[in-house]
Amino acid sequence: MIRSSIAPSRQLLSPTTGRQWLQSSRVRGGLVGKKHYSRTRKAPVISKAIPTLDGVVLPVRGNNAFTTSAILANDSHVRSPPSPSSESAIAPEGVPRPPQSHPVQTSPGSSVDGRAQPPPETNTPPPPPPPAPKKGGRFRRFLIYLIFTTGLAYAGGIWLSLTSDNFHDFFTEYVPYGEEAVLYVEEQDFRRRFPNAARQITRRVTGPREEGQNVTIPGKSGLSWKVSEEESEAKEAGSDVSRKGKHMSATEVNKEKTAAVEQVKAKKEAAPAIKKETTPAESKKPALEEARSPALPTASPVQPLSIAIEDEPTVQELMRIVNDLISVVNADESSSRFTSTLSKAKADFEKLGERIIAAKQESYKFAQEEIEKARADMEKSANELIRRIDEVRADDAAQFREEYEAERERLARAYQEKIKIELQRVQEVSEQRLRNELVEQAIELNRKFLSDVRSLVENEREGRLSKLSELTANVGELERLTAEWNSVVDTNLTTQQLQVAVDAVRSALENSDIPRPFINELVAVKELAAGDPVVDAAISSISPVAYQRGIPSSAQIIERFRRLATEVRKASLLPENAGIASHAASYMMSKVMFKKQGSEEGDDVESILTRTETLLEEGRLDDAAREMNSLQGWSKILSKDWLADVRRVLEVNQALELIETEARLRCLQVE
């Protein structure tokens, strides 16, 4: 609006008039003659003189950079044109005339500071003072400012509405004519981006907007704890390559897209009928303008491209892209513009497929010829090789026969010599055997003699030898008892060491300020158990996360439960499918709820938290975990991590108690 009011005034103002007004303002301000020139000139300046009607010479720059003119103050022929605005306070005739200008220096200045010398003083009388402006126009200025501010506010509101959905709702609902302005801007933007859209689509029948209809948000629009499960199922389904999907076929995607386009068309056709049935009141209104028929005739859809080349993934991918383009164009109502182009492209692709098939057949034929040539050469080489092998085999057979005969004669001679040596050795062995038998008989006689002597000596010393045998038996019994007691002592020592190792694990878990790993302590317990299956089973029942990262102590569990109880109370009033409003309401209600004390009975969240805290203070972690496990909904989801830590602590404690019990059983078995 402001631009439209300023544009006509720009056309009426001539350059000469503008320069006159500027020059008169310089004269009134005492700035006449203070002209600055550039210190450097790119081209020489050629001054010209233009005579006027009154004989005044007007200097003109030769490089057409700018033109200055000096007009006498008493010239009645040159006047500034009247302003197009009829509301101006100063009449066009009251504009002061510019004073007589002095000759302007046309050559570049040579002063040090780059400024021109002041013009010589003249005896021209000063111009008359301008008439005082009339007081008034305050309401006009206020109205102009109001219109300008309102326009800026509407422009900024429309711009923010196009960028922010929240501000769009506020602007269109609470600002007068805001919705119409936003719709107009969006329609103009759509027409600018799609100038031919109005020609291709039929006019849509629009009904009156229901101003009183409330906008509702469904109950299942909030957050849900099942999102992670759906994402995990989607990931598992996406990672399974054996399932049916886009990677199995290139044509199924095109069929699915074509089916989706047809479904959208069916919905669009069914939408007007449904709208007419649901709004019977509109039947009384005058009928709207009938839909116009499309300007262009409806073209027949282009058939999908089909090339019988299944072993070329590149061709299949290209065919899939072309079929996608054909499906999109067929779905568009303005497809008649692209039918010829797509048909030509389809024909080119079919020719390309035929050329690929022909090239493959030619390459296959050439490969078959090369294979036949190679096969013939191979058979010829094989026959030649067989002939050479037969010749070499015959030569080798003759040579082997000669070597065989020579070797047979050598073996016969060696066998004869060996027989002679064997006979000689057999004779020597028989002679040695006879000598050995004689020696054995002599030894047997000596042994018999010694036994007789020993029997006689034993009979004489029977009393003394009997006492020595009893002492030997007693010493053996003492040695056996000593060995048994040593094993008992070793077992007790191992049991004590196992008990000490278990106590070390328990103290490491109870005395640590933060959870820390206890792998070394478990390794010591396992080594001291010496392969005991009960101890090994107890250690293996502990979760690897527990002994690799550590478990919290009882004080840490209680402290963490107290922090958890605050969050659970905030979510205690939330339903399963809660939205943002439910979360806010539950948070505000948790601030005014009273905290119970003691052992309360009931299934509500506050009673369960009170009983759990009492059980934790008594050291009954198992019962406390059972109480927290009975929670439902968001309360159970919030306490899931705390329950996992408590389960790990219970597993470790149960395993340690089992190991201690096994150590006590060992002691009882030894006794």
Curated annotation (Swiss-Prot):
Keywords: Coiled coil, Membrane, Mitochondrion, Mitochondrion inner membrane, Transit peptide, Transmembrane, Transmembrane helix. It comes from Coccidioides posadasii (strain C735) (Valley fever fungus). Residues 342-433 form a coiled coil. It comes from the Eukaryota. InterPro entries: MIC60. Component of the MICOS complex, a large protein complex of the mitochondrial inner membrane that plays crucial roles in the maintenance of crista junctions, inner membrane architecture, and formation of contact sites to the outer membrane. Plays a role in keeping cristae membranes connected to the inner boundary membrane. Also promotes protein import via the mitochondrial intermembrane space assembly (MIA) pathway. Belongs to the MICOS complex subunit Mic60 family. This is MICOS complex subunit MIC60. Residues 1-11 form a transit peptide. GO terms for biological process: cristae formation. It is a single-pass membrane protein.
